Amino acid sequence: MKSIAIVGSGISGLFLANLLEKNTSFSYKIFEKKPSLDLSDGYGIQLSVNSINLLNKIGFQTMNASEVFFPKKVNFFDAKVLEKICDIDLSQFNFENNRYTTLKRSKLIEFLLSNIPKDKIIFNSDLINIEEYEKLKLSFSDNTKEEFDYIVAADGVYSRTKEILFKKEGTPKYFNSIALRGNIQNFENSDISLYLGSNFHFVIYPINQNNEFNFISIVRKKLVESEITNRSLFKDKRVR
């Protein structure tokens, strides 16, 4: 049996773990540097029909119906005058149980975690080195070491795993845009609404059957060099 180390417990890492749970040819462990996963109510996520097709292979269709939403259209608006420009019928891309879906990201994480034994996820595991012999030897900041046949880098945009493997620090590229996110209650719309403006746009869409909506805006903004190199500016900051 071959062994796999999954570094990172985001959506991609947890999805892979779900697939491996169904494959007896591999053993695996997930290493997460955080002490726990934040499953508090968070922002929304849109899942294409192709994504749902993959998720249904691990039982996503059994999700509680009240925790997901199936928008039928994307409506495009002129943000300045609030006039509708056009729309796209999303239902034309649906097939069988694979429908364009929106929900809270935290609910998707909860679903992915529900199929993974708790002892398969090792928290507080900060990877610091990888040595390649007959197997891959992983070293962590708490002085533990483990060996695996394969390693999967699923630790996100600031992937320490890829930095170690390629011996190059990952530097984000800033494209003069920032994202603003929020949650809205009781917005009168059952579809995805995209508002287009000059140097900005924002999107509002339902994330469940309880009249909760996700808001995200992309705004063009230039940063000075000191701001671009300050990684703390790129972290998720919540304002209540």
Per-region residue spans from a language model:
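Beta1/beta-strand and adjacent pyrophosphate-binding region of the FAD-binding site
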Residues: 1-12
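Conserved Rossmann-like nucleotide-cofactor binding loop
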Residues: 12, 36, 158
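Active-site substrate-recognition segment that forms the wall
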Residues: 191-225
